[in-house]
Amino acid sequence: MKKYANDRGIRIIGDIPIYVAFDSADAWMNPELFAFDEDMNPIEVAGCPPDGFTADGQLWGNPIYDWEYHKKQNYAWWIRRIRHCEVLYDVVRIDHFRGFDEYYTIPYGMTNARIGEWKKGPGIALFHEVKK
């Protein structure tokens, strides 16, 4: 499809969401990439803290990455993910880019995002690996 579009002067922009779903193939095939307990339940999940728009914050529920594991693997999963998207799209946009700098975690099982904490993400190190 990309070649067909490109041959007609059309460029395709595609999105990569920063997080995958708990019940995704990525999470179940690669549990070591995520902060899961021994029963494969998330230890914490993604979201946003309360703000002027919502007193409860945003509880997205996606599992949180084990960034230390990703770092030890030189971010190989992320590199494969981005490279695959480069085949499909001319421009790749990563949704919630800020989450690579800092991300908000909520203990698994909470019904809102009032209780949570900001943690440091991989930062520019991940993108240096992607660029290699």
Task: State the predicted function of each range.
Residues 20-132:
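Alpha-amylase-like alpha-glycosidases and glucanotransferases acting on alpha-linked glucans and related
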Residues 5, 15, 94:
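Conserved, mostly hydrophobic/aromatic
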Residues 1-7, 11:
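Active-site pocket-lining segments that scaffold enzyme catalytic pockets across diverse folds
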